[in-house]
Amino acid sequence: MKSAYIIFACLLLMCTAAFAGEADVIEVEVRRIGGDTYKFDVTLRHADEGWEHFANKWEVTAPDGPVLGTRVLAHPHVEEQPFTRSLSGVKIPENLTEVIVRAHDLVHGYGGKTVEVKVPGK
């Protein structure tokens, strides 16, 4: 019986990381700061649990996949949810009228809610 409890406890610990879910992009604001350069303010929601499981970056991508900009998140935001961070200097090719913003966490990688946004002035 004791071994059943140990197995159950191990399974519970292994599954705990999955409960935080994937990192979701919930809002994006884009501003042109000159020429083909833009600033992104991105709001994420993720149930950060600490250094082992937190949203560690978000990216601006072209619809066909190339990454145009990455904002690294250096620490967990356990007590600050949702949270907004900015990235300036994102170069967007002239032919793109929309981009996709996606978030990444240390356990699940990509896969949460993404936001497709129109590029101002295009």
Give, region by region, the residue ranges found by the protein language model.
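Bacterial N-terminal signal peptides that target proteins for export
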Residues: 1-8
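Edge beta-strands of extracellular beta-sandwich domains
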Residues: 110-119
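N-terminal signal peptide c-region/cleavage motif recognized by signal peptidases
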Residues: 15-17
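Short, surface-exposed binding/anchoring microloops in extracellular/periplasmic proteins
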Residues: 21-58
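The feature marks short-to-medium sequence segments in extracytoplasmic or secretory-pathway proteins
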Residues: 53-78
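Residues lining hydrophobic/aromatic ligand-binding pockets adjacent to catalytic sites
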Residues: 59-61, 86, 113
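Short, solvent-exposed, Trp/other aromatic-anchored flexible loops in extracytoplasmic proteins
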Residues: 69-100, 104-109
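A short, structured loop/turn motif at beta-sheet edges
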Residues: 32-36, 60-67, 91-97
